Amino acid sequence: MSSGTSGDQISHFGKTLTTTASLVFGSQSMEDTILSYSSPYKKILHDTITSSGGTSSLMKVERSGRMFTPFRTRNSAFQDIFHASSGRGYFKNGFSDTRTSFQVLSYLSDAMLADIPSSESAAATSGKLVTEKGEKGKKKRAETAHARGPSLYQGFEASLPTINQTITTHQKKQIMNRDIKSIRESDATPEDVGQDVDIEKGEEETTHDEFTLPKGIKPEHLSNSYSIKNLKGAVQTITDNLDLLEIQKNLAASEIRELDLKMEKLKLMRDLVFRRVAKIEQNELFLEKHLMNIRERIDMIEEYNLDNDTDAEKAYEEATSAPEDTKDQYSELPDANTAESGETVVQEPQVNLASAQKSLKKRSKQTGYSHKNHEKKVQQHEFRHLRKTYPTLQQYYEPGANILSFDSAHEDNVTCLDFNLPFGTLCSAGKLDPTIKVWNLSKNKHVASITGHLATVSCMQMDQYNTLITGGRDALLKMWDIQKAIDNDSIPSDEVCIYTFDSHIDEITALSFEANNLVSGSQDRTIRQWDLNNGKCVQTLDINFATGGNLSRSMIGSGFLNTNNDHPIIGAIQCYDAALATGTKDGIVRLWDLRSGRVVRTLEGHSDAVTSLQFDSLNLVTGSLDNSIRIWDLRTGTLADTFSYEHPVTCLQFDLNKIVVANQEGTVKVYNRQEKKHWFCGGDEHSENAVEYVRYKDGYLVEGRANGDINAWAI
């Protein structure tokens, strides 16, 4: 038998001893234990401590100041296991004689001795190693207490079947391994090996499932026997086996409780580490934000040639070395401020900054576009690959767990939302409300509100550097620097707005931006491409063919005042470099080349309006009012997969692992692309509070509902 199997048996035997002993002693009241007031054990222990049974005592050791030094020299403790050279030496100590030590260490109560089944049980019961009147007076109660729990012997006996079964199973596995090895060395086929394994597996399952009567008892003998003695013997044997099974059950229950305690401790440890990771990631976000601010300031200083390290150092040296009466020349400048970190901050000359600000404003008025803000956008794109950290805390939530909720974030249904990164910044908009609300996802609070649109905001996109572009029913596109609103919630909205694009003449229904390109779709049946370098429209694509016919000028002009829920002509747009994908009301997905402004491929299959789409390097996923999701292979232009829901699809996003869908139901639908399985998260599937909009990034999902609630989930 292997050492691992022997270790398991010893461990199981130890648990058996512990559990049985706890049942024996736990079944008796405190007054009935061997440590009761009149117990001989207590008397012997008292004699040992007070030196009644020996030449020295624990009390004398304590008074003399001698210390117990384990493993260094010969111990003067009551029990010295490590220096006992023989059985007699085991009972020798410095506190009592050998006889007293033997009585203390070998004492067994009458209740324990009475439990040993033997033909001489009566003699064992009457003969005691130590007797005292108090012990005899409690014999009856001890026997009554014994009826409530098993003995040590019974516990040992109960462990034998488990040990025997372990030995038998191990021997069978050894035989099977030898047989398989011999078969592999021979010319046997794989089918023969599989049959042998199946036979062994079947025999093992049969062994576990079969239940038999105790040894020596057969069902046919019981049914044909007329001997009361034999039948009573069978009753006693079966009763004893039931007692053993009860002990085995208690052992198993004890193991379950032990595992539960370990799992609870592991859960507590996991929660502590989880909170530690959350705190670390918040610190990372804090440092990343300041790192970006420093980079922006460096760019501004380089652009306007404001570098004055030499002048600043010279001014600092003069300020620190000049006499007190000569420091009046700096009275017009603020004193050196002490930062929270304890470092001294030297104020920059105000003249250069003021002239730079005037120059910046003048340049902005001349070009009609804030060059500084545009440079910020370009720099942000270049710094995408320089980001040092990225949040991963959402990966450690249980799938489908609610991370946070903003109840009644908007008075009406949420029309659109987007966030920069998990636990970062979220922007959202509601129906019939032109206000954009900004939320901190790590602190779970509202941090700013931005105004500027004249009507409902119908679409938006946000990058990971807090640049937001929105489109509304007022036919306007606006670019925002959300970081300004976060840093100062009282700042005027016109300072948060970087630029306004105003060439459309009807509601903006879809937009997408990437690098220096912005593409927008409108109810005026045009798609416009914008250059973010100068804010100008560089191309207009006409899509009148999407639905046939033309809209009247009056209908176009009054579009942003219309509050009906007609589905948009252009339902979804995404651009990447020179590639553009559009989904329109006719159910057709068109792939465009922005360099030529022409359609290079059409994907037909939806029977109703396309409301959402997204593509990567391999696939294009589209959602439609026909309740279906279609996955297209961009390499061949063919349909790779499709599935449907009970209600129309209004919004979707995907990555390599999952597709998340909003379809006017009370939950977010999730499709696992690897396992081909569907599941949902977020409340009641049949709730009237339907999910209107979803955004999903790296396992972090945010959804907006018809009642204005916003929730974040880990998937």
UniProtKB/Swiss-Prot annotation:
One of its GO terms (biological process) is peroxisome fission. WD repeats lie at residues 409-449, 452-490, 503-542, 564-604, 605-644, 646-681, 685-715. The keyword Repeat applies. One of its GO terms (molecular function) is ubiquitin binding. The keyword NAD does not apply. It is a peripheral membrane protein. Keywords: Coiled coil, Membrane, Mitochondrion, Mitochondrion outer membrane, Repeat, WD repeat. GO terms for cellular component: mitochondrial outer membrane; mitochondrion; transferase complex. Its main location: mitochondrion. It is found in: Mitochondrion outer membrane. PANTHER family: WD REPEAT DOMAIN 5B, WD40 REPEAT PROTEIN. This is Mitochondrial division protein 1.
